[in-house]
Regions:
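Glycine-rich phosphate-binding loop signature in dinucleotide/nucleotide-binding domains
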Residues: 1, 38, 189-200, 253-260
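Active-site phosphate-binding/coordination module
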Residues: 26-119
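Asp-based phosphoryl-transfer active-site loop
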Residues: 2-19, 214
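Conserved acidic, metal-coordinating active-site core of Asp-based
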Residues: 94, 98-101, 105-216, 225
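Hydrophobic packing residues within well-ordered alpha-helices of enzyme cores
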Residues: 51-55, 187, 214, 230, ...
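Short, structured coil segments at secondary-structure junctions
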Residues: 58-59, 67, 161-165, 216-217, ...
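Asp-based, Mg2+/Mn2+-dependent phosphohydrolase catalytic module
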Residues: 216, 220-222, 226-263
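Short hydrophobic/aromatic-enriched beta-strand-loop microsegments
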Residues: 60-68, 81, 124, 169, ...
Length: 263
């Protein structure tokens, strides 16, 4: 069997949205692929510390995380690229001039740093676990690495601030999330590191933010529960995540020949 190089999104691909836990047949499939000699990795926008909280318990040790900025091979972090520092500083200057609150992620943890309470006053607390560090003397000119920036801004106010588009970002309710967003580039860097041919890459995803890693050079598989835009770009559309879609796709292509329910 020819070796393939698998990269899986996490949320709603490997996991059940209702429980946020990995689907048993999907977890089994990851390890069955490894048993068959394939390379298995996660490809996610999650920060490294959040990704390993998911992957360590299930024993997956290869990661393309932080939206492609961070590469982990066999449990060892090889790189974690911050935002372009000049762009990051420019975004923060614009936010300050506009009177918009912001917080910054400066390391691989749930800590975010702020110089005042404007972000919390304008956007409220983030829905995920976050440790807020107040530092009134925070000076972006003295910070060399910024991994994420969150800027408080209502959706209807975006047209008034054209600078928001100077770097890719996600809308997260009442604020904008600026982060590295190049999972495909991360996959390509990983393939170069391990010396694998890119035509043997296989990616699984479900959401529009997975479009970036769907590439004509390799096999792109969309989950049945995925977005229509992603399905249209996919080489193959499998079943829903909760209907064993990951396992069924791997069986369909002959990458595994056993079945989780018939062991």
């Amino acid at each position: 069997m020819k070796k393939k190089y698998f990269f899986f999104d996490i949320d709603a691909t490997l996991t059940d949205d209702a429980t946020h836990k990995i689907i048993p047949s999907a977890e089994w499939t990851l390890h069955e692929l490894e048993r068959n000699g394939h390379f298995v990795s996660i490809a996610t926008g999650r920060a490294h510390y959040k990704t390993v909280a998911f992957t360590d318990p299930i024993g997956i040790r290869n990661l393309v995380c932080c939206g492609g900025a961070c590469l982990v091979k066999d449990g060892v972090m090889l790189e974690n690229v911050p935002l372009p520092i000049d762009t990051a500083r420019a975004l923060i200057r614009h936010a300050e001039e506009a009177g918009l609150g912001y917080i910054m992620m400066l390391d691989d943890s749930d800590k975010v740093f702020m110089k005042d309470f404007r972000f919390l006053e304008q956007a409220g607390r983030r829905t995920e676990l976050t440790t807020y560090i107040l530092d009134p003397d925070l000076n972006i000119e003295q910070i060399d690495a910024i991994y994420k920036i969150y800027i408080a801004m209502a959706r209807e106010d975006e047209p008034n601030h054209p600078w928001v588009s100077m770097h890719g970002h996600l809308r997260m309710g009442s604020y904008l999330n600026y982060q590295y967003d190049a999972k495909k580039d991360g996959i390509l860097r990983m393939m170069k590191l391990i010396g694998g041919p890119v035509e043997d890459v296989v990616v699984f995803g479900d959401a529009v933010n997975d479009l970036v890693m769907f590439d004509k050079r390799w096999t792109s598989i969309a989950m049945g529960n995925g977005m229509e835009e992603l399905k249209q770009k996919a080489d193959y559309v499998t079943g829903d995540n909760t209907a064993d879609g990951v396992m069924r796709a791997c069986q369909h292509f002959g990458w595994i020949d056993r079945d989780y329910y018939r062991l």
